[in-house]
Amino acid sequence: MTGFIVRWAILLGLARLLAQTTLGADSDPAHMQVNGTKPMAWPGGVIPYDITKLSADEQTLALRAMARWMATGAQLQFIPRSNQVEYVNFTGRTDAGNNTSQDGFQKGKRVDINITAFWWHQAEWMPAHELGHALGFHHEHQRWDRDEFVTIHYENIKPGRQHDYDWIPQTNWIVSSTAYDYRSIMHYRVCWAGACESECKDGDGNSPCAVIDPVGTNFDRVIGQWDDNHISATDAEKARRVYGTNAAAISR
């Protein structure tokens, strides 16, 4: 039994060392998303959608968000759903508590997007963010190498929201060859999902309640701001790498 315990301790130590050397020296294994899988791209870049449960104003914002992604120059086509089994479904639920979507194409089932009432009044920011998930993109601040770029203050995260900050291994990303992007539409703001979010000052990584603090940079006022509802240049590059390039969309 003693020999077994020794061997187990050695293996555990090696596993921790491997995690530190390959996934970021400061990444705490307790903050790693487990049982994750690499998202799948939508076949042919065709995404059927259903927005019939939304109000007229919400439908307009959802369509604008789709147009933002198509303007990236990626080979993407959003089409109204007819009888497809796999499609993006805007649920129309504004009381779900959080904005949610599954990541990527789901074989044999739909992707549900929930957006709270507050965010339907903030232009197309959140619809574009949740569509990013539906296209297969994780949160930027959950990258395997994020510790080189941001500090995550887990002590300030709202109960039940840690999963939105846990880091995801590189093997579980649909594309992992782009640089870290503070301006990504998939990056949270400084205070989001914070336990004292109402007291936190977005754009100030030194705020006592801040969850995200850029490492050695002045990007506090950049991360998660999504200026003019833009999808960043790096977001666009990711979309083109996954779905191919639509030269006609780029030239417009």
Where are these regions (language model features)?
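Zinc-dependent metalloendopeptidases
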Residues: 19-252
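Bacterial N-terminal signal peptides that target proteins for export
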Residues: 1-9
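Bacterial N-terminal signal peptides
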Residues: 8-19
